[in-house]
Design a protein with these regions (language model features):
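N-terminal accessory/capping or targeting/presequence segment of soluble
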Residues: 1-98, 155
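Flexible, acidic/His-enriched mid-domain "rim/lid" segments that flank
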Residues: 88-155
């Protein structure tokens, strides 16, 4: 049986769905990762969930998140790229593209609130479509552990 993300990706003819932001402001990112971070990171939702975080957050992400895989931007030589690029954002965009290509992404979905600059950059190499976040729909239906936590909080 296909997982909800596999079903969503198949219905939309996508190789993955990407979130970039912080999980304090983006409930979908927290829902998918259970990793609470105020700094920007990326989540690639495919059959497995992969986080791309800064090297300072890698250990904590591996320990706290429910992601299948946690990768560091340093694995993609972000510091070397930063030395070569005029702007740090350009280095991050190169890392992100390398990360996505390494995960076989040719057709990518992103949520409506996705950062515009990153979206425009990715369009040069990847087919990107914007849609509602699948995680927003999944968050509407509470799992038993979530219902228990709500009940406990309301007592």
């Amino acid at each position: 049986m296909l997982s909800p993300i596999q079903t969503f990706l198949g219905q939309h003819n996508l190789d993955g769905f990407l979130f970039v932001g912080d999980s304090i402001c983006d409930a979908d990112m927290y829902y998918l990762s259970r990793f609470l971070a105020g700094d920007r990171f990326a989540i690639l939702a495919q059959e497995k969930t992969t986080l791309l975080v800064s090297s300072m957050e890698t250990g904590r992400a591996r320990k706290e998140s429910i992601a299948d895989e946690c990768l560091s931007t340093s694995q993609y030589q972000i510091m070397e790229k930063m030395r070569r690029c005029e702007k740090p954002e350009e280095a991050y965009l190169q890392v992100l593209l390398e990360f996505l290509q390494g995960h076989g992404i040719k057709r990518l979905g992103v949520p409506f609130r996705f950062p515009a600059g990153i979206y425009q950059s990715l369009l040069q190499d990847i087919e990107v479509s914007v849609s509602d976040s699948p995680a927003s729909r999944w968050r509407e239906i509470k799992r038993q552990e979530e219902l228990d936590a709500i009940a406990c909080t309301q007592r």
